[in-house]
């Protein structure tokens, strides 16, 4: 009986550990995706002044 109980507890803890690890990996992936989105947004926003300058130059040149 002790061996059976030990086995049940061990398997339960192993399953719980695996679930916690998967949850942690999922949260880490979501965090990294959010960081990637922020990085892309920063790159896009940094291009806006260059685009404005290019349009301004074209308008000034042809206008």
Swiss-Prot record:
Predominant place of localization: secreted
Cellular component aspect of the GO annotation: extracellular region
Signal peptide as annotated in the record: 1-19
Localization in the cell: Secreted
Coiled coil: none
Biological process, per Gene Ontology: defense response to bacterium
Family affiliation: Belongs to the frog skin active peptide (FSAP) family. Phylloseptin subfamily.
Protein name as catalogued: Phylloseptin-Az1
Organism: Pithecopus azureus (Orange-legged monkey tree frog)
Organism ancestry: Eukaryota, Metazoa, Chordata, Craniata, Vertebrata
